[in-house]
Amino acid sequence: MVGNPVQLCSPITQNGTYTLNEAFSNYKLIYIVMFKDSNIYASIFQEALLGAGYKANISQAGYNLQLTFSGTSVTAVINGASSVRIFGLN
């Protein structure tokens, strides 16, 4: 059973590096929600499966998002999304 999600940083609205409230590796699952207009796209990644450099790449309906996690920060490259939220789940 999965616990309650914890938002790991303020909403991401532009390219850049954001500070996480705590290390993403403290969570088994990383839940990423991407918003554009009235559409919501969500993806769940296992922390251990984010891959080399801890990258998450999401492409949905012409919207692209690349997140690179490192300790207590995340670097975002957003193309088309208006807002992104990142949650940790155990």
Describe the function of each predicted region:
Residues 38-52:
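Short, surface-exposed terminal/edge motifs of secreted or surface/virion proteins that either
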Residues 7-27, 36-42:
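Surface-exposed ligand/attachment interfaces on beta-rich extracellular proteins
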Residues 68-77:
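Noncatalytic modules at the cell exterior or secretory-pathway interfaces
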Residues 49-66:
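Contiguous ligand/interfacial binding patches
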Residues 1-4:
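A signal for long, low-complexity, Ser/Thr/Asn-enriched, surface-exposed stalk/shaft
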Residues 79-90:
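Short, structured beta-strand segments at or near domain termini in extracellular proteins/domains
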Residues 17-19, 61-66, 80:
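Nucleic-acid endonuclease domains
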